[in-house]
Amino acid sequence: SPGPDRLERWHAKWASKQTRWHLQQEHPLLVRYRADLFGPQPRHDSPSAKATRSNVLFPLCGASVDLAALALRGYRVVGVEGVEAAVDALLETFGDEVEQAPPSVSGSLRLRTAVAPGEAGSDAPAVLRAVEGDFLHLSPSAADALGLPRFDAAFDRGALVAVLPEDREAYVATLAGLMAPEGRVLLVTVEHDGFAGPPYEVREADVRELFSPAFAVRPLQREDRMGAEPHWRERGCTRFEEAAYLLTRHRAG
């Protein structure tokens, strides 16, 4: 489906401030599985810390607080978001946006950057970058044109489950094209009945079918969320589970 149609409902949700999916603190699964996603990390104040920090991708990021949390720890964070109001909120909350001269654009995609004071004891500012535009347009060549790296890590919470089912294969192909060999993705999905979506149900069989050609798939956990999030019952659910997977990009060839 074309980009404007894909993004129209999300523009409407932001315009009416229907953003209940945002958490006010770092996502618990990102905290729990940080070592699985990034591998062992040096102390933040060690000389090698900055050099070994990962390039981290957040597809369909909205204004999630997770991006700022990692950027402030020295990770090189890039979010991708199709709703301008969401990118505005993300960067304004983080720090001061830096005007790009000339603007960094590739087709309908625009790279925006904000800076904030870095970690205590560090002279280097924290940097958060966001690509404003349709994630499915972020091909490897577009990423190169914007000066983006291939990513060592990515966090997908609320991205795949928000994508229309007919766009899932294109989403996975786009994500795979942006990941470095052996890059890791922490993927959070939901399984439920009662309504179609979003968030759409993505079962383990779906995850394996979608990702196995390009990634090794390792299930991490599954949790019943009906007790903690009773509003799903109001939407007709008799079950609502959250599942997490670690995906590791195959080596090229």
Predicted regions: what is each one?
Residues 54-56, 152:
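Generic beta-sheet signal
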Residues 57-62, 159:
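Class I SAM-dependent methyltransferase "Motif I" SAM/SAH-binding loop
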